[in-house]
UniProtKB/Swiss-Prot annotation:
This is GPI-anchored wall transfer protein 1. Glycans are attached at N15. The gene is gwt1. It is an enzyme of class 2 (transferase). Its main location: endoplasmic reticulum. GO terms for molecular function: glucosaminyl-phosphatidylinositol O-acyltransferase activity. The keyword Flavoprotein does not apply. Probable acetyltransferase, which acetylates the inositol ring of phosphatidylinositol during biosynthesis of GPI-anchor. It comes from Emericella nidulans (strain FGSC A4 / ATCC 38163 / CBS 112.46 / NRRL 194 / M139) (Aspergillus nidulans). GO terms for biological process: GPI anchor biosynthetic process. The keyword Acyltransferase applies.
Amino acid sequence: MDPDYKSRKEAFVSNLTGGSILEINAVTLVAPASVFLWSVLQSRLSFFTPYGPAALITDFLLNVLAILFATTFYSSAPWLLNLLLVSPAFLILMNSRSRRTQTKAKPPQTATAQHGPGASLPIHPFLTTYRAAMMIITCIAILAVDFRVFPRRFAKAENWGTSLMDLGVGSFVFSGGVVSARSVLKSRERGASPKKTLTQRFTSSVRHSVPLLVLGLVRLYSVKNLDYAEHVTEYGVHWNFFFTLGFLPPFVELFEGIATLIPSYEVLSLAVAVLYQVALESTDLKSYILVSPRGPDLLSKNREGVFSFLGYLAIFLAGRATGMRIIPGGISPSNTPQQARKRVLTRYGANIPVSRRLANMPYVLWVAAFNNAQLFLFCLIETILFPSVHRASGSGKNDEAKRTDFATSPILTAFNRGGLAVFLVANLLTGAVNLTVPTLDVDKTRAMAILVGYAALITGVALGLNKANIKISL
């Protein structure tokens, strides 16, 4: 890469301060709004059954391109885009309620009831939707941020501040924590069987982390050898997000032993966040991370990645705490005290600036509060428009699969099932585009054409993997 252009690229994503949380909420609300319109079309008109070309294109427009437009063309008017999405949904609801009430989500009457291990852990379409929407906006943002059509206030803040991409990084980790609760719940259901020792669990988690750590090494090698533009203050000289993701499972297993003494992942998450924040405020750790010169040792060169890992660990544990509550039976009124606690903690942490670079306590609380709100919205949409998903607890697995398939976008299902592979492809395509296209000098029309093509390609990869029944999720 040309040295002058590389310097311009690095300056383009440096020293940014982010934007307002209200605007971030408005932009991210596009995902639930799109799912709301999709759900109305499906529950009232069965528009996506069968899933032909028209259904595929509409699905792509609603669940992928709407998010792309929210972060580009409609970045200055996200509320307008939300209105454009929900208005037709309400019109359909008003005109079809009486005619479609009895058929909007009628469960099939074929399979017999099944019981056994895992029967109390139903499939939740809203969890699939939530994780897939997060994956889509992440994949879009990692390439869009290199174009001028993507507002700078959405890019990662340098030291302090809130931005869309700052939230995306934490949400990626939080969602991983949510789904990790399923394995914990299943192991607790099998209480009679011999439990694995800490060493066995730790070894197993390391094996699962190896692919992510390998990807981290591949990315490190590629960036250094291709002279790719890099933002060193993001994670450090050698560290990258794949390393953070890869080291989380083994460290979480170490906390699993503590969970027997403190049987609350909420408390564990908060304890990690608070202790880390105390260290930041009462020692020189904060200034060491933010302003100290980089020494020759590995810790100094990668201090952002190493120490922010503690914040991401707290976020992962917070996600697992949420998963432990919602996976067994969805979101219910009994879970509202948890929401109240998070609101109180968010207000308490508001006196300290949010820092994604530090992954400090306010950042942890912001990410947890946002993701709980998103889960609530997706669950609310599902509960209202697909009530049969939450009924017939004694029906068989075949019935459950048919009901969940009816209530879930095929594109969102594909992104959720192929999460790791899609994220890898998105990173490879982002690198390829940046090495072949002068993204800083591209006009808006060409930038949007590239981004739409990129979105279509990663969607095609996700659908192809799902069609081949290949599951490589994060």
